Amino acid sequence: MKVKGSLKSHRNRDKNCKVVKRGGKVYIINKVKPRCKARQGS
């Protein structure tokens, strides 16, 4: 999983990318391409 400062460009990488909030953190998940996963953090 990649840790990015901003997920804006990351969520447009694939049409199956979804933005989810879990436990106060923002994640990008993709069930079709799991290698597109990312978490927002500084």
From Swiss-Prot:
One of its GO terms (molecular function) is structural constituent of ribosome. The keyword Cell membrane does not apply. GO terms for biological process: translation. Keywords: Ribonucleoprotein, Ribosomal protein. Pfam families: Ribosomal_L36 (PF00444). GO terms for cellular component: ribonucleoprotein complex; ribosome. This is Large ribosomal subunit protein bL36.
